[in-house]
């Protein structure tokens, strides 16, 4: 689809994911052992054969740049590119003021590509979407803007833009993060919310961005300013994400916002269910990323006991000796000494766990080194004196930490 340009918003600071975002942007946070959060948005474009993509970066972007260079370098192929673009600061020495401002400051790059449609997507959610199906819906409706949406429990909807639609899928109401969200007619416990993914007719987008940039009263945000201004015209439509079908996937779609530590941990636990709602193994929808050249994971018994790996994901380069690993995700080069008991944990890679450690519901960031005999997640009151502990009791060991020495 040569006339389509992708713009991925990847500048999120991710303050609610701290300490995982202390040294990296939210889109570059590791996920599922092998991936980064941004990989899922990129795969949605690439698997739909949409290969002209700008990735707009901002905060702490070095890790993200490195990942894109190593794993997503398709430049050199005619008319195909995935290019990261740092904050342009074209309107002064400041960061992007909102999602619309981020796109506006890169207007020149878009105009040079001469697209017919522009797809603007976020980069910090876990889901699979065939974007071509959304584009087809957009074209059939002759829309100037199409917003993708999904049903959300009403109690959670205030964190999103809440949408009202008519029988034809036309947007007839929109409120950004309302305190009292409106429910779907006939479904009092659910609301229809924006996923933050947009398909614009290019010339409409360019015009709206210029007009919005000149408005000093605007917050320069799609949800707060652009969409409320556009939908009363009657040519803004809503694409129902639940109708998106991918070969080899379950009929019930999966979408997770992993903006908090608890949500991030739960999304990993979803991967480990017997009948996982989100699969990493669909050959018809491969999940591309950067895979470092590492040997296979190794599991060996020790004098302290046999190795047990139960309902877990273990990445290449990992070495587990005589320990028990249950419902956990071990990233690249996780080194687990003997007699450890690790349950419901996420190790982000290059982690050393000493002999006899006990870990329960712990996220261990990269390059951490935990001394032999250390217990984490067993006594939360004690853990709170040393580490970040989430509302639901998930302990986070920060990047590069030395614990118990």
Swiss-Prot record:
GO:BP terms for this protein? glycogen biosynthetic process
Q: Which Gene3D superfamilies match?
A: Hexapeptide repeat proteins, Spore Coat Polysaccharide Biosynthesis Protein SpsA, Chain A
Which superkingdom does the taxonomy of this entry point to?
Bacteria
Q: In which pathway does it act?
A: Glycan biosynthesis; glycogen biosynthesis
Q: Which UniProt keywords are listed?
A: ATP-binding, Carbohydrate metabolism, Glycogen biosynthesis, Glycogen metabolism, Nucleotide-binding, Nucleotidyltransferase, Transferase
User: What single Pfam family name could you report for this chain, choosing any that match?
Assistant: Hexapep_GlmU
What span is annotated as the signal peptide, if there is one? none
Q: Which reaction does it catalyse?
A: alpha-D-glucose 1-phosphate + ATP + H(+) = ADP-alpha-D-glucose + diphosphate
Q: What class of enzyme is it?
A: transferase
InterPro entries, per database record: ADP-Glc_PPase, ADP_Glu_pyroP_CS, GlgC_bac, GlmU/GlgC-like_hexapep, NTP_transferase_dom, Nucleotide-diphossugar_trans, Trimer_LpxA-like_sf
Which molecular function terms from Gene Ontology are attached?
ATP binding; glucose-1-phosphate adenylyltransferase activity
Q: What is its EC number?
A: 2.7.7.27
**Annotated alpha-D-glucose 1-phosphate binding sites:** 96, 161, 176-177, 194
Give the quaternary structure: Homotetramer.
What family classification does the UniProt entry report for this protein? Answer: Belongs to the bacterial/plant glucose-1-phosphate adenylyltransferase family.
Q: NCBIfam families, alphabetically?
A: glgC, PRK00725.1, PRK00844.1
Protein name (database record) = Glucose-1-phosphate adenylyltransferase 1
Species source reads Vibrio parahaemolyticus serotype O3:K6 (strain RIMD 2210633)
Q: What is the lineage of its organism?
A: Bacteria, Pseudomonadati, Pseudomonadota, Gammaproteobacteria, Vibrionales
């Amino acid at each position: 689809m040569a006339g389509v340009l992708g713009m991925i918003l990847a500048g999120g600071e991710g303050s609610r994911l701290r300490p995982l975002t202390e040294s990296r942007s939210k889109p570059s946070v590791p996920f599922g052992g092998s991936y980064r959060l941004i990989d899922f948005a990129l795969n949605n474009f690439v698997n739909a054969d949409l290969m002209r993509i700008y990735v707009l970066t901002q905060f702490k972007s070095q890790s993200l740049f490195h990942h894109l260079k190593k794993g997503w370098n398709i430049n050199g192929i005619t008319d195909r590119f995935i290019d990261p673009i740092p904050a342009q600061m074209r309107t002064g020495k400041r960061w992007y003021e909102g999602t619309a401002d981020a796109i506006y400051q890169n207007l020149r790059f878009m105009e040079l590509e001469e697209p017919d449609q522009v797809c603007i997507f976020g980069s910090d959610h876990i889901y699979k979407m065939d974007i071509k199906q959304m584009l087809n819906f957009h074209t059939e409706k002759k829309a100037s803007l199409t917003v993708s949406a999904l049903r959300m429990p009403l109690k959670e909807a205030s964190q999103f833009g809440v949408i009202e639609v008519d029988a034809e899928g036309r947007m007839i109401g929109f409120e950004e993060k309302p305190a009292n969200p409106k429910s779907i007619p006939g479904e009092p416990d659910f609301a229809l919310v924006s996923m933050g993914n947009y398909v614009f007719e290019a010339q409409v987008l360019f015009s709206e961005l210029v007009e919005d940039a000149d408005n000093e009263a605007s917050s320069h945000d799609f949800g707060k300013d652009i969409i409320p201004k556009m939908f009363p015209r009657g040519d803004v439509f809503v694409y129902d994400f639940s109708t998106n079908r991918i070969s080899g996937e379950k009929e019930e779609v999966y979408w997770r916002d992993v903006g908090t530590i608890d949500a991030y941990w739960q999304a990993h636990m979803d991967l480990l269910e017997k009948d996982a709602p989100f699969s990493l193994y669909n050959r018809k929808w491969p999940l591309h990323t950067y895979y470092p050249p590492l040997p296979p994971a190794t599991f060996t018994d020790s004098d302290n006991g046999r190795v047990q790996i139960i309902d877990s994901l273990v990445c290449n380069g990992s070495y587990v000796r005589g320990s028990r690993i249950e419902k956990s995700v071990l990233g690249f080069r996780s080194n687990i000494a003997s007699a450890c008991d690790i349950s419901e944990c996420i190790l982000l890679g290059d982690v050393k766990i000493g002999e006899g450690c006990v870990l329960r519901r712990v996220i261990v960031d990269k390059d951490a080194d935990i001394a032999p005999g250390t217990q984490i997640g067993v006594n939360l009151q004690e853990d709170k004196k040393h580490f970040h502990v989430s509302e639901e009791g998930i302990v986070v060991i920060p990047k590069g930490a030395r614990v118990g020495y």
